[in-house]
Design a protein with these regions (language model features):
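Acidic, contiguous N-terminal accessory segments
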Residues: 4, 12-145, 338-347, 354, ...
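Conserved, mostly hydrophobic/aromatic
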Residues: 44, 64, 113, 152, ...
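Feature activates predominantly on carbohydrate-active enzymes
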Residues: 93-270, 277, 283-301, 436
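Hydrophobic faces of well-ordered beta-strands that scaffold small-molecule active sites
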Residues: 150-154, 181-183, 241-245, 300-304, ...
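Active-site beta-loop-alpha junctions enriched in small/polar residues
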Residues: 157, 186-190, 246-250, 307-309, ...
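Active-site neighborhood of glycoside hydrolase catalytic domains
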Residues: 254-359, 363-379
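Flexible, acidic glycine-rich loops studded with aromatic residues
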Residues: 352-358, 365-505
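Extracellular glycan-associated modules
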Residues: 495-649
Length: 649
C-alpha cells in the first residue's frame, strides 16, 4: 500500500502545471492540474460598469480577435465556465501595477488599478499564443514589478523615426509591460562628417513650431496634433511618453535657426549661456509646448536635456548649473516633473540645482556619480552607457546589446560599476537607448527595430522581475521565439515559424498585390525574368517602407531604396535577356545573384572623410518589399520567397 501511495503521490505532483512562460517572467505562480480552453461562446465578463474596466475589456477583446480570429463578447452579469472575468478590487500587496489571475474552468482576473488589469491581459494573450488551442494552464498568478519605471529612449533627432513606427513601438512596449518611452526630439551630427563646418552639419528639430517657423526639420517632423494624439494613444496603452528637448548642448538645430545664440567658444552645437537672448529663445520654445489647457506635451514629465555641455571653465560650469536649475523650475511652473541627463559631477560647482522631485538619467558615472546624486536628492533612471547604449555600426558602444550578460547580471540597481540595493527607493527603474550618432550611415528604421526588439524583451524581464529570474537565458531565448511583437504588429516582417518556402507565384502581373507587405531578415527572393525596355524608375515591388527597382531612377540599374537611401547593383536586365534572379538579405548585407553567380554582395561599406582621417560604416540592408508589383514591361515568373538565406541554410 505504501508503494502504491508513493507512486500515486508522485504522479499527482507531476501533473501540477509548472510556471508558464511569459515575458516578463511571472513573480508568483501556484500550479494546479489541467488547462482552461475558451469555448466558441467565451465572453469577457465585467463585474462593474467602471469605464476603465469596460475599456480594457474591449481592448482585450479586440486584441484577442486580431491575434486569434475569435470574437469574445464583452458582457456584464454572472460568469459561466469558459468565460474571462475582469474586476477591479483592492489588494495593497499588488501595488500600482500588479494583478492576480486565477485560472480554473474560467479565468478570474483582478487588479487594484486599471494599469494592473491591462498588464494582466498582456499576460493572457502571451499565454494563449503559445499553443494552437489557446489554452491556459490552470493555477494562480500574482504578478507585480520590482521597478515602477521600465523604459526605452529613442533618438529621433539625428534620424527621423516615422510616427507609424512610434505608434507600433508603444504597442510593443505595452505587450512586454514596458511603460516609459523617452523621445529625443532634437540633435545633430558630428561636424567631422560635414567638412568640419557647423553650418553644413546636419541638425534637426522634429516638432512643428509656430513660435519659430522654420525651426522644424524639413526631412521629417511631427505636427502638434499627431504628437498629441500619439501621447494619448500611449496613455491608453499605459505607456508614458517623456518628450525631450535637449539643451544647452546638442542644440545645433536651434543655432542654425538663430545663430546669435550659438557659442563661439565651445561650438555652435552649444548654446551661449552668457546671452540673455538664449534664455528668451528657449523659454519661448518650451512654453509653446507646455502652456494652455491642452498642451502639446501631454504627460506628467518633460525632459530638458542638459547632456554633455563643456566644463572647460568654472564660469561656464556655474552658468550651466544655473541654466539647469532655471529650466527645471520653468517646466515645473507648468505642472510638469523635470527630467535631466546626469551631468552635475562633470559640472561640479557652487550654484545650487534643484533636486527635490527631479528625475535624472544616470548614464555615465563620470558625469553624474549615482551615489552622490542620490544623496543630493535626485530620483534616478538607470541607463548605464557601457551596458545599454546602442549606436548602430558606430564602432563604439554596442551595435547589438550583450543580452546574455544583461539577463544574467544586470538590473537597474547596477549603474556602471556602482551597485545599489535592489528596489532602492531612489532608483525609479531602468531604460536602454538607441543613439543615431552617425547621420548618413544607411541605417534604416527596420535596422533600428532589429537592434531593439530583442533587448526590449530581455530588459523587460530585468526591470519587472529584477534579479529573481527563474529560468536560464538559453531557455528564455528559445521560448520567446513563440511570442509576437504585439497584437497586429510585425515590424520585423517575420513570415512563418520554421525555415521554409513561405510564398510563391507562377506569374507576377504588373500592379498586382501579394499576401505579405514585406519579408524581414533572413530571406531569399528569387524569380525568373525575361527583360523588356524599362524606363528609369521602374519598380519591381514596393511596400510602405521600401522599393525594389528593376531600373533605378538615376542610372537604370537594379537596386532598392529605403529611408531616403538609394543602393544600386552593377547589373540591369537588358531587353530580351532571360535570367534567374536571387536576392538574399540579412541584417548585415543584401546579395544579388544572377543565374547562380554572385553579382554583388552589399555588405557594410567604409566611407572616408577628411583625407582618410575619419570614417563611417555605411549599411546597405533591405527588408524586401512585396506588397505591390510595379508597372513593368518585363515578364516576371516563378516568384519564390523563403524565410531564410538559401545559400546559408
Amino acid at each position: 500500500l505504501l508503494v502504491i501511495f508513493c507512486l500515486t503521490g508522485s504522479l499527482t505532483r507531476a501533473a501540477v502545471n509548472p510556471k508558464p512562460f511569459v515575458v516578463p517572467e511571472l513573480k508568483q505562480w501556484t500550479g494546479k492540474d489541467g488547462n482552461f480552453t475558451p469555448g466558441k461562446d467565451a465572453r469577457i465578463v465585467c463585474t462593474s460598469q467602471n469605464p476603465e474596466l469596460l475599456r480594457i475589456a474591449r481592448m482585450f477583446a479586440d486584441d484577442y480577435q486580431q491575434m486569434f480570429g475569435q470574437t469574445l463578447s464583452v458582457a456584464q452579469g454572472k460568469a459561466t465556465p469558459g468565460d474571462f472575468v475582469l474586476s477591479l478590487s483592492a489588494d495593497k500587496k499588488l501595488g500600482e501595477e500588479g494583478y492576480a489571475i486565477k485560472i480554473t474552468d474560467r479565468v478570474a482576473i483582478s487588479a487594484p488599478t486599471p494599469t494592473g488589469l491591462y498588464w494582466s491581459t498582456r499576460t493572457l494573450l502571451q499565454l494563449a499564443e503559445q499553443n494552437q488551442e489557446r489554452s491556459l494552464p490552470q493555477g494562480t498568478i500574482r504578478d507585480y514589478p520590482d521597478y515602477p519605471l521600465r523604459g526605452f529612449m529613442i533618438d529621433c533627432g539625428r534620424k527621423f523615426i516615422p510616427m507609424a513606427y512610434l505608434q507600433d513601438l508603444v504597442k510593443i512596449m505595452a505587450y512586454y509591460k514596458m511603460n516609459t518611452l523617452q523621445v529625443h526630439l532634437n540633435d545633430n551630427g558630428f561636424k567631422q562628417y560635414f567638412e568640419h563646418n557647423w553650418d553644413k552639419t546636419y541638425a534637426a528639430f522634429r516638432l512643428e513650431s509656430e513660435t519659430y517657423p522654420g525651426l522644424t526639420a524639413r526631412d521629417g517632423s511631427y505636427s502638434k496634433k499627431e504628437f498629441i494624439d500619439f501621447q494619448k494613444q500611449a496613455v491608453s496603452n499605459f505607456v508614458e511618453i517623456i518628450p525631450e528637448i535637449d539643451v544647452p548642448a546638442h542644440s545645433l538645430a536651434l543655432t542654425h535657426y538663430k545663430p546669435e545664440i550659438g557659442s563661439k567658444e565651445y561650438g555652435m552645437d552649444h548654446l551661449d549661456l552668457f546671452k540673455p537672448e538664449t534664455y528668451e529663445f528657449v523659454d519661448a520654445l518650451f512654453k509653446e509646448y507646455l502652456e494652455g489647457d491642452n498642451p502639446v506635451f501631454v504627460g506628467k514629465r518633460v525632459h530638458i536635456g542638459t547632456d554633455e555641455y563643456s566644463n572647460a571653465k568654472k564660469d561656464v560650469v556655474e552658468k550651466f548649473r544655473a541654466f539647469t536649475d532655471h529650466y527645471i523650475r520653468f517646466v515645473e511652473g507648468f505642472g510638469k516633473q523635470a527630467v535631466v541627463w546626469g551631468a552635475l559631477s562633470h559640472a561640479k560647482g557652487d550654484t545650487p540645482v534643484k533636486s527635490e522631485n527631479v528625475v535624472m538619467n544616470a548614464w555615465y558615472n563620470g558625469y553624474a556619480d549615482p551615489a552622490t546624486m542620490i544623496k543630493d536628492g535626485y530620483q534616478l533612471i538607470s541607463i548605464p552607457d557601457g551596458l545599454v547604449y546602442i549606436v548602430p555600426k558606430a564602432g563604439y558602444y554596442y551595435d547589438y546589446l550583450n543580452e546574455p550578460y544583461l539577463y544574467k547580471e544586470w538590473t537597474p540597481a547596477h549603474i556602471g560599476k556602482a551597485v545599489f540595493d535592489e528596489k532602492h527607493p531612489s532608483i525609479l527603474g531602468g531604460m536602454f537607448a538607441i543613439w543615431n550618432d552617425h547621420v548618413g550611415n544607411g541605417i534604416s528604421v527596420k535596422d533600428i527595430h532589429h537592434r531593439i526588439f530583442s533587448p526590449l524583451q530581455t530588459l523587460s524581464v530585468k526591470m519587472w522581475t529584477g534579479a529573481q529570474t527563474g529560468i536560464p537565458y538559453e531557455t528564455f531565448n528559445e521560448k520567446r521565439a513563440l511570442l509576437s511583437e504585439a497584437p497586429g504588429v510585425n515590424q520585423l516582417a517575420r513570415i512563418g515559424k520554421k525555415p521554409e518556402l513561405v510564398y510563391e507565384r507562377s506569374t507576377v502581373a504588373p500592379g498586382s498585390t501579394s499576401d505579405y507587405p514585406e519579408i524581414g531578415y533572413n530571406y531569399t527572393v528569387s524569380f525568373d525574368i525575361t527583360g523588356a525596355k524599362e524606363s528609369e524608375g521602374t519598380e519591381l515591388f514596393r511596400s510602405p517602407n521600401a522599393v525594389f527597382y528593376l531600373s533605378d531612377p538615376i542610372r537604370g540599374m537594379m537596386g532598392f531604396a529605403r529611408d531616403g537611401y538609394l543602393n544600386t547593383f552593377p547589373y540591369k536586365v537588358n531587353p530580351g535577356e532571360k535570367a534567374t534572379i536571387q536576392i538574399e538579405g540579412n541584417n548585415c548585407s543584401t546579395t544579388l545573384r544572377v543565374n547562380g553567380k554572385v553579382v554583388d554582395e552589399m555588405n557594410t561599406q567604409k566611407l572616408y572623410f577628411n583625407a582618410g582621417k575619419d570614417s563611417m560604416n555605411y549599411v546597405r540592408t533591405l527588408v524586401f518589399p512585396l506588397e505591390k508589383a510595379g508597372n513593368f514591361n518585363s515578364k516576371v515568373q516563378n516568384l519564390k520567397v523563403y524565410n531564410y538565406c538559401v545559400s546559408k541554410p
